[in-house]
Amino acid sequence: MLAAAEVGNRLSKDEYRAVVPDLRVGLVNAQYDLRNADFPLIVLVAGDDRIAANAVVNRLNEWMDTRYLRTHVFREPTPEEQDRPRFWRLWKSMPPRGRTALWAGGLFRQVAAVVEGEVSEREFDTWLRHLEALQGDLLNDGALLVKLFLHTPAKEQRARLKRAKKGAEEGWRVNPRDWAALETLDDARPVVERLLRRMSAPGAPWTVVEATDQRYRDVTVARTIHDALTARLAEDAPAGVEVSPKLFAPAAEQITVLSKVDLSASLERDDYRVRLDALQARLHHLSLKARRRGVTTVLAFEGWDAAGKGGVIRRITQSLEAGDYRVIPTAAPTPEELRYH
């Protein structure tokens, strides 16, 4: 896939000036139309050229209406993020329907970790499967994903870094990480190809952008976003599905798992007290052990017996230390919550 972005695509100054004004207007108009749509737009910018990716993020913030765009740059995970599920910071950055999120960074860091031996092949495969699952959830919920991978050949990157080092005007853009990344670029290539293949899904393919020429790069990125968004906005809203009332007619006898629950089960009070005390003591010690090991536990309670759920929760929390748990009641989604995935 990367070879397709090494053919020498360029855009002259005159060509650039001819297409940019209309392209910018089209991008902003598409953003305005998106405001009334029932889906969000997520633009993912990744690549093996950090400087190019940074420039593209800045360019999109210049060309698009930032009132309806939120940019999230994912650097090294903070201590708080390391204590959370692996994609927690992505969950927090999801846009509501009708808005756009620009995500940058994070993906190539995982590739570098594989190349440097910090992450095993098995761990990388697990990470990919979780990322595929998240992508599938977003697509099934209607999100439009535009995924851009910026590629600059190692030879061109090396020449650019050398020029920047000599020139005071551009030298500040370069840091030691860029030189270190350049040394592992060839080793990273098969890992990148694997990531791009695994994460290319129907409706959400990767667009590999040749980033050597900045004019070609910026126009290609903006045009890809514009074309994907306008095409999606032009689609007819899905027609409602007619469902026969017979589907909801009560059957003579519906056997489910709940039909087999023994509602007459009970304990004598003395036996209940003894067993409850023993189990609460065991739960208390397990919770302390989990705290020391950094193990997180989520308990989900569902059912039509609200008093029963509340009673169970109270008896569990009685055995825990107050700082170790949080009870979160979940009601029907609010209108604001319904705007998000």
Where are these regions (language model features)?
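Glycine-rich phosphate-binding loop of ATP-dependent small-molecule kinases
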Residues: 1-341
